């Protein structure tokens, strides 16, 4: 927190000795150019005995006139010594800045210091108040909240280019620290107002626990309800700049009929609201990303667990395919022949009806190794068929 010092002259802010910035030159001397009297000799005509001629600072040409102008230890032609802005001849005094000369009126118009409060020019003869790099009129050096003029010895704070006295700064600090982020906006929309209404049966409980140790007798802050037109004007100005200067706030206050303090608090709350929305959006994005990442990790783990368990192979029923016999292609019954009626006491089927016949159904399924032995034991089935036929007709 700074302490205001006494008023000082503007010339102390910009000393004359700084040649690189600007300085006022009070004395413009006119000197007579020294010429050698009498008839000119041959050496003078040839230039061997001529003194070194003065060079004009403006046009950089030698000065051959009888009179020349001396400014800041430099020589000028009389016609070259003029204002760089209005081209008027300079006779008594001038201002020097960036190797150029200016008259008093043009210099004050172009390079005069401006008040940081009203943005108007400050005359060189006025007393000013300084705060860091800012310069103020005596009347403009006041608090932006209570508009009390700050004098020598008063404590103040320069915040965002605005002056605040000690009392208002502490009030604003307490106000910003006491307001929660959810209630930072003094002007709520209709849907937000509906969400802020407490439920029945919770009113007394919220009153008792809402202050968190603060004085319950502390009066509530006045609440300003903005109209649609005022809100539109504020939002349009906020889109241009979220931190308007004092002049813009005063213009908005005059247009909307509100005080400058209300305008300032609205912009502060709006900035806090935008920060809160941006923070909430960022949290939602992070939550969605974490959920998506968790689902991907869970699915990958499930796939890994399923891949670790190999599926059980279905029990393969060992079905023994019956080998195709050599007579499969030449079926004796495919030409419509009816099988002969065999007598029951035929010696050929005696072994089949005996005890050594098939004992179970499983004996019907023969492996490939059993087929050869069966053929060797029984013989060629076609030969057996012919023998059966011949024996039938013989009987």
Curated annotation (Swiss-Prot):
Q: Main subcellular localization, coarse class?
A: nucleus
| PANTHER family (alphabetical) | LIM HOMEOBOX TRANSCRIPTION FACTOR 1-BETA, LIM/HOMEOBOX PROTEIN LHX
Record's GO cellular component terms: nucleus
| Compartments where found | Nucleus
Annotated ranges, domain LIM zinc-binding? 56-106, 115-168
Q: How does it assemble?
A: Interacts with DHX9.
Asked whether the UniProt record includes NAD among its keywords, one would answer no
- Cross-referenced Pfam families: Homeodomain, LIM
Species source reads Mus musculus
Note the coiled coil stretches, chain numbering: none
Name of the protein in its database record = LIM homeobox transcription factor 1-beta
Q: What does the record give under GO molecular function?
A: DNA-binding transcription activator activity, RNA polymerase II-specific; DNA-binding transcription factor activity, RNA polymerase II-specific; metal ion binding; RNA polymerase II transcription regulatory region sequence-specific DNA binding
Among the GO biological process terms of this entry, one is: camera-type eye development
Q: Which residues bind DNA?
A: 219-278
Q: What does this protein do?
A: Transcription factor involved in the regulation of podocyte-expressed genes. Essential for the specification of dorsal limb fate at both the zeugopodal and autopodal levels.
Q: Which UniProt keywords apply?
A: Activator, Developmental protein, DNA-binding, Homeobox, LIM domain, Metal-binding, Nucleus, Repeat, Transcription, Transcription regulation, Zinc
Q: Which residues form the signal peptide?
A: none
- Region Disordered, residue ranges: 176-229
